[in-house]
From Swiss-Prot:
<feature type="binding site">
    <location>
        <position position="277"/>
    </location>
    <ligand>
        <name>[2Fe-2S] cluster</name>
    </ligand>
</feature>
<keyword id="KW-0408">Iron</keyword>
<dbReference type="InterPro" id="IPR007197">
    <property type="entry name" value="rSAM"/>
</dbReference>
<dbReference type="GO" id="GO:0051537">
    <property type="term" value="F:2 iron, 2 sulfur cluster binding"/>
</dbReference>
<feature type="binding site">
    <location>
        <position position="73"/>
    </location>
    <ligand>
        <name>[4Fe-4S] cluster</name>
    </ligand>
</feature>
<feature type="binding site">
    <location>
        <position position="76"/>
    </location>
    <ligand>
        <name>[4Fe-4S] cluster</name>
    </ligand>
</feature>
<protein>
    <recommendedName>
        <fullName>Biotin synthase</fullName>
        <ecNumber>2.8.1.6</ecNumber>
    </recommendedName>
</protein>
<dbReference type="InterPro" id="IPR006638">
    <property type="entry name" value="Elp3/MiaA/NifB-like_rSAM"/>
</dbReference>
<dbReference type="GO" id="GO:0051539">
    <property type="term" value="F:4 iron, 4 sulfur cluster binding"/>
</dbReference>
<keyword id="KW-0479">Metal-binding</keyword>
<dbReference type="Pfam" id="PF04055">
    <property type="entry name" value="Radical_SAM"/>
</dbReference>
<feature type="binding site">
    <location>
        <position position="144"/>
    </location>
    <ligand>
        <name>[2Fe-2S] cluster</name>
    </ligand>
</feature>
<feature type="binding site">
    <location>
        <position position="113"/>
    </location>
    <ligand>
        <name>[2Fe-2S] cluster</name>
    </ligand>
</feature>
<keyword id="KW-0093">Biotin biosynthesis</keyword>
<keyword id="KW-0001">2Fe-2S</keyword>
<dbReference type="InterPro" id="IPR002684">
    <property type="entry name" value="Biotin_synth/BioAB"/>
</dbReference>
<dbReference type="GO" id="GO:0005506">
    <property type="term" value="F:iron ion binding"/>
</dbReference>
Length: 347
């Protein structure tokens, strides 16, 4: 039996995908190198053991504090180290955040993520964010935050406020990491993930492809994530968006669409119970490419015209694509509620 074929087949026992935490780079590479039909077939087969293959999760992302970040992430328009078009703002007002969350829910989002461009939150700001989290939770939405590094005590406060998920990406492989970030170590990120876990928060953690890394780096990132003590509940995969004024522009190049789909498929096989999210960069993807990603196991998208400081497909376009594919999402629930306003208010 071909070893690469055996790797994924051994991940499914009695119809259930069993997560592993001891992946080797060679195994990830063997999966990636499979003939495309075999790779996508295996990914879809494993996907079906844990998820409804015809359902896509929809989430919304809001920058509640933009720009002026002390970190030097070489891809980020919000870093204070670079001259970009992004202007630094203060933390948004509570009522504005809640109103945005309400509109996101009415548009079809089931989860609302609040992002702040900080190295780490100050206590006075964290208190305000905890109130925002509680208010968004009262709307009946799942809550997520990405605020930079956290202490265990800060994670505990967010969890007590009702936060469900904490996002803190590893961005890339351990080998490539130092080429794009110098002000925050990869270990800093791992420790923040541990603090979130210890507090009872679910973890959202992924990275970016197209920063100038090699395929081995992309697979190295997936191996890093898959070998964590617990797999992230959500794995966002971002495709590089060109940003004016950042140093990564010198080496960045969006991956070939087939290469990106292969990345999604390997992520699905290696982390069979994690939600795999198509994140930034979808505005550059054709409908056909997104459909292939979903066939390969991607089952979540961010909706809304803007993701932090970058563009995103219009919500109406996303709804139309999922309808064409015959896939379900919260868009269907919203449409039903609008068609039956009396009954939906009574629920």
């Amino acid at each position: 039996m071909n070893i690469s074929m055996g790797i994924s087949s051994l991940s499914v026992i009695n119809g259930s995908a069993l997560p592993r935490h001891n992946w080797a780079r060679e195994e990830a590479q063997a999966l990636y190198d499979l003939p495309f039909p075999d790779l996508v077939f295996q990914a879809q087969s494993i996907h079906r053991t844990s998820f409804d293959p015809n359902h896509v999760e929809t989430a919304s992302l809001l920058s509640i504090k933009t720009g002026g970040c002390a970190e030097d992430c070489g891809y980020c328009s919000q870093s204070a180290h670079y001259k970009t078009d992004v202007k630094a703002t203060k933390l948004m007002a509570h009522d504005d955040v809640v109103a945005t969350a309400r509109r996101a829910k009415e548009s079809g989002a089931g989860r609302f993520c609040m992002a702040a461009a900080w190295r780490n939150p100050k206590e006075k700001d964290l208190e305000r964010i905890c109130h925002m989290v509680s208010a968004v939770k009262e709307l009946g939405m799942e809550t997520c935050a990405t605020l930079g590094m956290l202490t265990r005590e800060q994670a505990d406060k967010l969890r007590a406020a009702g936060l469900d998920f904490y996002n803190h990406n590893v961005d890339t492989s351990p080998e490539f990491y130092g080429k794009i970030i110098t002000t925050r170590t990869l270990q800093d990120r791992i420790e923040t993930l541990a603090h979130a876990r210890e507090s009872g928060l679910k973890v959202c953690c992924g990275g970016i492809v197209g920063l100038g890394e090699q395929v081995e780096d992309r697979l190295g990132m997936l191996v890093l994530l898959a070998n964590l003590a617990e797999h992230p509940e959500s794995v966002p995969i971002n495709q590089w968006n060109e940003v004016k004024g950042v140093p990564v522009n010198a080496t960045a190049e969006a991956p070939d669409p087939i290469a990106f789909v292969r990345m999604i498929a390997v992520a699905r096989i290696m982390m069979p119970k994690s939600v795999v999210r198509l994140s930034a960069g979808r505005q550059y993807m054709s409908d056909e490419m997104q459909a292939l990603c979903m066939l390969a196991g991607a089952n979540s998208i961010f909706i809304g015209d803007v993701l932090l400081t970058t563009k995103n497909p219009q919500t109406t376009k996303d709804a139309a694509l999922l309808e064409r594919l015959g896939m379900t999402s919260r868009f269907d629930e919203v449409a039903t509620d609008k068609a039956n306003p009396v009954s939906s208010r009574a629920i």
